[in-house]
Amino acid sequence: MAQFYGNEQIQHTLHQMLLRDRAPHGFLFYGETGLGKKTLAKQFLAELLCTGTEKPCGSCKSCKMLADGVHPDVRFVEHSGKRNGFSVDTVREVCVDLASPPNEGNAKCYVFGDCDAMDTRTQNLLLKAVEEPPAYGYFIFTATSPASLLPTVRSRIVSLAVSPVTEQECCAALAERGFSPE
């Protein structure tokens, strides 16, 4: 699975939420395109779903399925329709799926990437699920701006601003992979 670099405070906050069993059931990761918001979502989900002692371990069944993109309790909801948004039918499927318990672990997770084009009707359909998810239900939205989501949706999730990687963080990431940072 791809490594997420930078934004140490966000990574620490997410880790602490999970350690203390205080993770909210909804997040919005927002920031410029190309910052790794979906990678951050995968990293969070790996830690949430991991069954190993050191989370994420990368070697348990859950970590391997997530890395391979076949975890039955994780759905990366795809855009559909003419306007590159999310279809009403897709959101209804998510709501129906959410009603059944997880297949493999203790959580079911839905990642809605690039929500800038998510229309009002679709967001309103999701509102009840986001507002009152079952104990095992988690939602992660990514967007370039928090204004992409309705205030009613935003008020029920935790919004975290993802920043560009600093030069120092970039050099450290290159060095970690065996490249000269110069």
Regions found by a protein language model. Give the residues of each.
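P-loop/Walker A NTP-binding region and its immediately flanking N-terminal helices
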Residues: 1-112, 123, 138, 151
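Helix-turn-helix-type domain boundary/helix-start signal
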Residues: 3-4, 84, 116, 160, ...
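Small/polar loops that bind or transfer phosphate-bearing groups
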Residues: 6, 114, 141-142, 162
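A short alpha->loop->secondary-structure connector
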Residues: 93, 129-136, 159
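Catalytic acidic motif of RecA-like/P-loop NTPases
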Residues: 99, 113-119, 124-131, 147
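Sensor-1/coupling segment of RecA-like P-loop NTPase cores
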Residues: 118, 133-150
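Short regulatory helix/loop adjacent to the ATP-binding pocket of P-loop NTPases
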Residues: 125-130, 145-158, 174-175
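Long, charge-dense, solvent-exposed interaction surfaces that engage phosphate-rich ligands
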Residues: 156-182
